[in-house]
UniProtKB/Swiss-Prot annotation:
Protein name: Probable cysteine desulfurase
A Pfam family matched in the record: Aminotran_5
Keyword entries, A-Z: Pyridoxal phosphate, Transferase
Phylogenetic lineage: Bacteria, Pseudomonadati, Pseudomonadota, Gammaproteobacteria, Lysobacterales
MF term (GO), any: pyridoxal phosphate binding
Active site: 374
Organism: Xylella fastidiosa (strain 9a5c)
Cofactor(s) this protein requires: pyridoxal 5'-phosphate
Amino acid sequence: MDRINTSAAPPTSPDWERLRTDFPLLQRHVHGKPLIYFDNANTAQKPQAVITATDTFYRRHNANISRAVHTLGTEATEAYEATRTALATLLNAPTHELVLCSGTTFAINLIAYSWALPRLRAGDVILVSRMEHHANIVPWQLIAERTGARIQVADILPNGTLDLDALHTLMTPQVKLLAITHVSNVLGTVNPIHDICRQARQRGITTVVDGSQAAPHRHIDIPAIGCDFYAITGHKLYGPTGTGALWARREHLHIMPPFLGGGEMIKEVSFDGTLFNTPPHKFEAGTPNIAGFIGLRAAVDYVRRIGIEQIETRETELLAHLTEELQKIDGMRLFGTAPNKAAVVSFMIEGTHAHDLATLLDLEGVAIRSGQHCAHPLLQYYGVTATCRASLAFYNTHEEIERFIAALLKVRKLLG
């Protein structure tokens, strides 16, 4: 299959302006103004390497995977499995412990119904944090309703950090599962996930980590983290939508029943019963998003070529600049000021509504998120119904931050 060379060693000092030109959509104008895309926690833009990889698959190699011996089928299967290998390398995890799926939401539901549902009983506790995305709350509520288990919530401190003392106190013998985000999608808080998982493991608590917001911005080392499950989403990692992965310990994958039934997840079928495939394919029923996963492989290679440490350094600098400028604005309220943060800033300006700000900013060519960010309990903690969220990626610039602040001041004046 045609290869795109995106696996070269990271440069000593990336040329961020040149890398920005790899993203076609960033060249757009919106309402006659150059686009400022500050909604990267929602989804990241795609480099040309990803677009080309997906297009090339459909033009030259389109076939189903694991179902044919012809050349196209072999090429498609090899390219698809190469994505599993690339993700395993990114996460420092074995390929046979990596389930390819549509994203973090699917991954967490897979854990909920294949691992938790058969094991939890009345009186057991599922522990979550206040800062979780709904995808790491609602599945556990559904499981609790069916099993009689209870959900307990570890709260946060006013600056948006997790209350670690409270979390450790809640780790009682009744807790069977801890589901926690690595990085908050609203606050940007980077949780001390290594310590949290170590504490949980010492107490015999199974850990589920939502890594959706972490994988694009932080180095992930699964063995070092020490969790039981780790889920990521491809479209936030500069890859196509409908892609993602679940890493799970081998011992869990072997005892978990399939979540969905169909082709690929079986070895043999008769009317007397079915012999299931081995993990991870046991959990990959049906035809997947083949082109999407081939695009995801290109995205992973692209990120590795830049270097995730370089990306983190770049985004930390951008975050410091953005935060400093926002703090100069009268009436500004920032949500989440943890010392260890990803490049996410949620904010409100006194006397304005988040949706009004975001709508008028769009007319200035600025794309940010407004609303509750799929985190209702977190916003309830802060006593607000909505916030604005600006989230950055390495391809954003200091000049964009200055233009964003100018646009924000203009909009604020319009709103009185």
